[in-house]
Amino acid sequence: MGTMVHIVEGTHHTYKNFFTKEECDHIISIFERDKDIVPYGTDTGYEGLTSTYSEYNWLYNKDIQPLNIPQRLFDLDYFSDWEYMVVQCWGNALHVGEELKEHYHGEIMEEHFRRMYFINCNIFLGGEYNKTWYKDIGYTHNEPGDLHLFSCELDHRVDHNIGHNTRYSMALDIYPDSNRMLMLPDKHMSRYSIHKRPII
């Protein structure tokens, strides 16, 4: 299903204004509205909104779907030769003093996706503290709507939030192989979503 996609180690691209400021504010409002009703993971090693990644995909949220995020990803030049993408999408809300320790996304527990190269995206949504550290480029300052796209072996982190408000971002893991999605146990279907490039 689909054509073979080769993901190069060390891939890292930045796209400005993937979301508008208004869209970022909208997503933040949905995160805040629904944070107490979405399922949370209990053994992810993370707390708060980040821990929902193992149980819930925000692309299924009826108030985020109108943003048509999968189509907008297909429209990025990096994905120009992708026919399918399997997407996991979650939110991060770092309150004052909280952090995301250095990590990379290639070390995953799901057997169906293990040993498979894939793409990560971080989209900064808002907050006074806007720095992210990536192993290849060091610290970068983000504006609301900025998207960083990078291969899954790249270490990255967010240091302690020293701003005066909560820092919000959206994260996505994006896989090119839809066949593996079809083999997933039903219990994971709420975690991943499959998308096909629209025929124009």
Question: Where are the predicted features?
Answer:
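Catalytic core of non-heme Fe(II) oxygenases with the double-stranded beta-helix
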Residues: D81-H188
